[in-house]
Design a protein with these regions (language model features):
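N-terminal leader/auxiliary helical segments
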Residues: 1-149
Length: 149
């Protein structure tokens, strides 16, 4: 919860969402979250010594092992997540586009998220720079939080 709250309030994250808000309204934050996931996956080796493929499989196995305690929302999403290997597909713009389309198909309102990968391509350097700044700040905040636990 700390990370979600921190992310939503961060000025750089908000700057990224403002770029999309007029077209995607309240879905802008969800979209930027996925864009940032893309940059994390793309640059995974910068942030982790563990191979992304190994991390992904470990994560999926953890979901399977702890299925009984997962939220209903997570349980509902889990088959799509694993079957389409969402975490690994975050590495590519095409993978993000597929995920956005799948999410768009499942929204009740007309979100048009399926089209937002166009903005990812159009503003790629800007989003990547914003992610890099944001993620550095997030790592520092998490480190501070961990020291106080």
């Amino acid at each position: 919860r700390f990370i979600d709250t921190y992310t939503d309030a961060h000025p750089v994250f908000r700057k990224s969402t403002q770029r999309l808000h007029s077209k995607y309204h309240h879905y802008a934050g969800v979209i930027v979250d996925l864009f940032y996931d893309h940059f994390l996956a793309k640059n995974w080796s910068t942030y982790s010594d563990e191979n992304l493929e190994e991390y992904t499989e470990t994560f999926y196995q953890s979901l399977r092992d702890h299925y009984d305690i997962l939220s209903e929302r997570t349980k509902g999403m889990m088959p799509y997540l694993i079957e389409h290997n969402w975490l690994l597909s975050y590495q590519t713009v095409e993978g993000i586009g597929r995920i956005l389309t799948q999410m768009d198909n499942r929204t009740k309102n007309a979100s048009n998220m399926r089209f937002s990968s166009n903005e990812l391509v159009e503003f790629y350097p800007e989003f990547e720079e914003e992610f890099t700044i944001f993620f550095k700040d997030l790592q520092e905040q998490v480190s501070l939080k961990m020291q106080h636990l």
